Amino acid sequence: MNAPLERPANSVDPKLLEILVCPMTKGPLEYDAARQELISRSAKLAYPIRDGIPIMLPEEARKID
């Protein structure tokens, strides 16, 4: 039997990234692995990822240019 694939502790499940959208615009998100953020270009917000869990609250998001 094959062992489940282990992901690094700070990574996000790729399947989750496929279904998540910006809660403000319902638009697509871009994953920034270096900063551990999900970027919404349309809302100009960066949602943090903490311990591999995306924090999809607009009040927790960082404004971007």
Swiss-Prot record:
Family: Belongs to the UPF0434 family.
GO cellular component terms, semicolon-separated: cytosol
InterPro entries xref list: Trm112-like
Name of protein: UPF0434 protein BRADO0313
Record organism: Bradyrhizobium sp. (strain ORS 278)
SUPFAM superfamilies given in the database record: Trm112p-like
Gene3D superfamilies linked: 2.20.25.10
